[in-house]
From Swiss-Prot:
Gene: rplI
Name of this chain's protein: Large ribosomal subunit protein bL9
Pfam families with a match to the protein in the record: Ribosomal_L9_C, Ribosomal_L9_N
Keyword tags: Ribonucleoprotein, Ribosomal protein, RNA-binding, rRNA-binding
Protein purpose: Binds to the 23S rRNA.
Entries under Gene3D superfamilies matching the protein: Ribosomal protein L9, C-terminal domain, Ribosomal protein L9, N-terminal domain
Keyword Ribonucleoprotein: yes
């Protein structure tokens, strides 16, 4: 009996592979536990169509992330904060403040956990990286100025 593995099965194969197994093992264990489906022509066509759709979605996400990267690399956000007597910041600029400024000034809503930057404890211009999906990373400028 031929089965299409839905999940990885130790000692047999990985998800998406078609394997030839004994009828009892295929029907009772693999199909019974939801690890595989009987590899009929209809099931294989359905699997290939789903695989193609998933790849198209990934390509679309990559394309959107590349566009976002191109947009972000041309912007600079400004964060104004109070300064001490010697011109130093009170505390430091947090990733949350950067994410809020990016949303308020440019309209991009990002997760603060996706931001990568050094501790910002002085005025100046800093590079901040935003990690996007599929290994894409965008850098933009953050200017910290006193009020």
């Amino acid at each position: 009996m031929k089965v299409l593995l839905i999940k990885d099965v130790k000692g047999l194969g990985k998800a998406g592979e078609v394997k030839d197994v004994k009828d009892g093992y295929g029907n009772n264990f693999l199909i019974g536990k939801g690890l595989a489906k009987s590899a009929t022509d209809a099931v294989l066509k359905q699997y290939e169509a789903a695989k193609k759709r998933a790849q198209e979605e990934i390509n679309y996400e990559i394309n959107q992330n590349e566009k976002l990267k191109a947009e972000l690399e041309n912007i600079k956000i400004i964060i104004k904060t109070k300064l001490g007597a010697n011109g130093a910041l009170f505390g430091s600029i947090t990733k949350d403040e950067i994410a809020n400024a990016l949303k308020e000034q440019k309209g991009y809503e990002v997760d603060k956990k996706a931001l990568e930057c050094d501790h910002i404890k002085a005025t100046g211009i800093y590079d901040v990286a935003l990690k996007l999906k599929h290994g894409i990373s965008a850098k933009f400028k953050v200017e910290v100025a006193g009020e």
